[in-house]
Amino acid sequence: LFSAPSQTGKSTQAALWAQHRGAEVLNGDKAAVRLDGAPTVHGVPFSGTSGICRNVSMPLRCIVLLSQAPENRIRRLGASEALALLPQNAFADASVREEWQRTLSLLLDLISAAPVYALACTPDVRAVETLEHALVRDGF
């Protein structure tokens, strides 16, 4: 699951994975995650600018927080760093205390269920190779 602010390259990275590794793209912009039982990613009926929105679900293997960079670098995040970065990409109204507390609780469950990586990347196949190498190294 790629996560990043708008215009960072989620659709680009997903397209690279589809082109070079045969990955299936659920949505080019947003996805829903279900945590009861095995964590699952679901396509949502909103495509954003990508035009890609499929009504399918897949197991959640990991979360990749994207940023643009002139060179590819990846690192697996610890729980506290992941928890500090993930809320930037979650839907929650921080002014509503109960909603924000529930969101943080869900994010804690999420980072317990799936590893979180930070990938600073280029918009080419080298980014795919960098992430793939880390996933294989870590047994995913």
PLM features per residue range, with description:
Residues 1-4, 18-140:
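Glycine-rich, often acidic-flanked micro-motifs
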